[in-house]
């Protein structure tokens, strides 16, 4: 039977066209250490130029979760790749690692070349923001597994750090200052609840502007996750950092303790930073308790850094010179977990 694979739902020619379209975007991410080009069986990266005493490779992998469903609804696919990169590289930079390269995995029901190109365009933009090379990936057309409009997206990154410069959090002491770096919005966590609260139960429209939002709801919800790599690497060159936490699923309450040693807790000063209107809208429409909000969402802070008190103001200044909005949001204390405003639990 001629064209049997195509009749089974897999269009090889469309796959070839997608690869051809994405090449120009991938090329913009290249670093001098990359060996070979797109299309090889494996991506290669030369580590011989790194003058580190004890080089350690740090890896991370993640996906975008159900934020993808918002991209499907809005038929907007050129920024979701930034989210995939951000979720991976932010996780490894908190250990002091410079992201070197990234690989993506796209699984779809139908390989539409223009859609795949837009996804990879976003991935490439994320890689440029993080300074890492997109050295490979896989696009799997899987009819019957996904509908023709659906796809899943995941990524994998590898970074490098000198062993003596790994940021572990083990030297954090009571009295260290916590600096928060502003998020761009919801980032890439909690979207199952977001959809239920705002779209299913609240019946809000993606095309309308609500409350104090400055953008239509769909655009607000699809804002890409902020990538903190370059400002954090600049910070590490200039100051000692004792611990860092990427505020993802689990919010403040789950993620800040991940960087703290036993016997040390975090006390957060509510009101010390701006909480974006999208979080207020979610809490109001969903009638969500404040504790639940801080246990699910980043609440306006995407990264938390622990530093000595005497360095805090200089570090805030450096981060703001790097284009970040940074605020002192609390400090470490004797104890455990996360409390708010004078030691109260929410």
Swiss-Prot record:
It catalyses: 2-formamido-N(1)-(5-O-phospho-beta-D-ribosyl)acetamidine + ATP = 5-amino-1-(5-phospho-beta-D-ribosyl)imidazole + ADP + phosphate + H(+). It is an enzyme of class 6 (ligase). Transmembrane segments: none annotated. Its EC number is 6.3.3.1. One of its GO terms (biological process) is adenine biosynthetic process. Disulfide bonds: none annotated. InterPro entries: PurM-like_C_dom, PurM-like_C_sf, PurM-like_N, PurM-like_N_sf, PurM_cligase. The keyword Cytoplasm applies. It holds the Pfam family AIRS_C. One of its GO terms (molecular function) is phosphoribosylformylglycinamidine cyclo-ligase activity. Keywords: ATP-binding, Cytoplasm, Ligase, Nucleotide-binding, Purine biosynthesis. Pathway: Purine metabolism; IMP biosynthesis via de novo pathway; 5-amino-1-(5-phospho-D-ribosyl)imidazole from N(2)-formyl-N(1)-(5-phospho-D-ribosyl)glycinamide: step 2/2. One of its GO terms (cellular component) is cytosol. It is found in: Cytoplasm. HAMAP family: AIRS (MF_00741). Belongs to the AIR synthase family. This is Phosphoribosylformylglycinamidine cyclo-ligase.
